[in-house]
Regions:
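Short, conserved catalytic-motif segment at the N-terminal edge
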Residues: 111-135
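Active-site-proximal loop and beta-strand segments within enzyme catalytic domains
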Residues: 154-191, 195
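Short glycine/serine- and small hydrophobic-enriched flexible loop segments
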Residues: 148-156, 199, 247-254, 332-339
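Active-site-proximal beta-strand/loop segments in catalytic clefts of secreted hydrolases
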Residues: 120-122, 197-201, 209, 235, ...
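Structured C-terminal helix/loop/strand segments within mature extracytoplasmic catalytic/sensor domains
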Residues: 2-110, 127, 253-274, 294-382
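Active-site SXXK
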Residues: 125, 136-165, 312
Length: 382
């Protein structure tokens, strides 16, 4: 019996030992399977992340291209709006405190003198005037109107510049340098009469031109342009204020800018005119000017061809000596004023066109959407 029991125990032990290899194999299999699955899962995560990163990079690249294209389009639109603004005429709403201060300083300076001035920038139409309603004796400034009338009518075919007029004794007056080489009875062309009246302010040439044109015709012509004081006062010179001066200068400028066969010829007479204190030879600035002088009246009206062309009328009661130096000084101050006008205009257009867009771009940078994390966050702007 004992042997039988012992044998039974041994058989049970053998059966248990036979089960262990299977269990070990099962565990090894499961462990191997786990490792395989884990590695596959890791590879999947890596592949997924790489794929995600790749796709997000592509999306971001496309978005960046779209943003850059939009920025370029916006920049082009802004530049067009800026150029439009720059080319617009000046308006009072754009005046800065600095420009106001410059104007006030100029006004305070002018209060020291008996004079009137008017300045008009041709491009922007900015205008500054002082004592503009005061009326002066025109003196030789009226000769500008003689010249414009003759050359305008020549251009329109109403007269020939080479037509002549007889120089008679009744036309001969003082201060007639151009006609000194002519004898009484000589014939003088209209072209030369205008040339002498402008370049050397020949008074006899002026008398002959007024006679040729007709006093009333010349007066009506000045009025038709917008002048209020043309030939008022009982002689062939009349009266003038700075507003009339600008009217004459504007018409002269328009004639010159038409680039007709006569434009440069007439312009050259005014550029070469004597007593021209609006030109600045040191800085290469030319001016198409006509002066006027009688007693204490001393004037300069001109188109100043600076970097930006402007009209300037300075009418004074200062006489030639003080008047000439004062006119030069005022012209320099006007150039400073004009510089401020353009700086003011540029800054105004920059603020108007670019500042709003720049504010929008700043806000756009402050709030950027982080697509990977799935929420909006503020990012530091470098």
């Amino acid at each position: 019996m004992k042997k039988s029991k012992t044998k039974s125990k041994k058989n049970k032990s053998r059966r248990k030992l036979k089960k262990w290899p299977k269990l070990v194999l099962l565990l090894i299999f499961l462990a191997t399977l786990f490792l395989i699955l884990k590695k596959s899962l890791d590879n999947y995560n890596i592949t997924f992340n790489n794929t995600y990163d790749y796709l997000m990079n592509k999306i971001n690249e496309q978005k960046q291209k779209q943003d850059e294209k939009k920025q370029q389009e916006n920049k082009k639109k802004q530049d067009e709006e800026y150029n439009t603004c720059i080319n617009q005429k000046y308006s009072e709403k754009e005046k800065s405190e600095k420009l106001t201060q410059v104007e006030n300083e100029l006004t305070d300076y002018l209060k020291n003198y008996s004079l009137s001035i008017k300045f008009v920038d041709v491009k922007t139409n900015y205008t500054y005037s002082y004592n503009e309603s005061k009326v002066y004796y025109a003196a030789s400034t009226i000769k500008m109107l003689d010249a414009i009338y003759i050359y305008r009518n020549a251009l329109e075919g109403n007269l020939n510049l080479d037509s002549t007029k007889k120089y008679t004794k009744n036309f001969k007056v003082a201060y007639s340098a151009g006609l000194e080489k002519y004898k009484i009875g000589d014939m003088v062309s209209l072209r030369n009469l205008v040339k002498y009246a402008i370049t050397v302010s020949d008074n006899s040439a002026h008398q002959m031109l007024v006679d040729y044109i007709g006093f009333n015709n010349l007066k009506k012509y000045g009025n038709s342009l917008g002048a209020k004081n043309t030939l008022i006062g009982g002689d062939n010179f009349g009266q003038i204020d700075v507003n009339d001066s600008i009217v004459y200068l504007s018409e002269l400028y328009n004639f010159i800018e038409e680039n007709s066969e006569f434009s440069e010829e007439l312009k050259s007479y005014f550029i070469e005119s004597d007593e021209n204190f609006l030109k600045d030879e040191e800085n290469g600035i030319k001016a198409a000017t006509k002066y006027g002088e009688y007693g204490n009246f001393f004037h300069n009206n001109g188109i100043v061809y600076a970097e930006n062309t402007y009209f300037l009328s300075i009418l004074t009661n200062l006489g030639k000596k003080n008047g000439s130096s004062t006119i030069k000084s005022i012209n320099r101050k006007i150039q400073g004023l004009q510089k401020n006008v353009y700086e003011n205009h540029v800054e105004y257009c920059k603020q108007k066109i670019y500042s709003v867009q720049n504010d929008w771009q700043l806000m756009n940078k402050l709030l950027k959407y982080n697509w990977r994390d799935g929420y909006e966050r503020k990012e530091k702007i470098i």
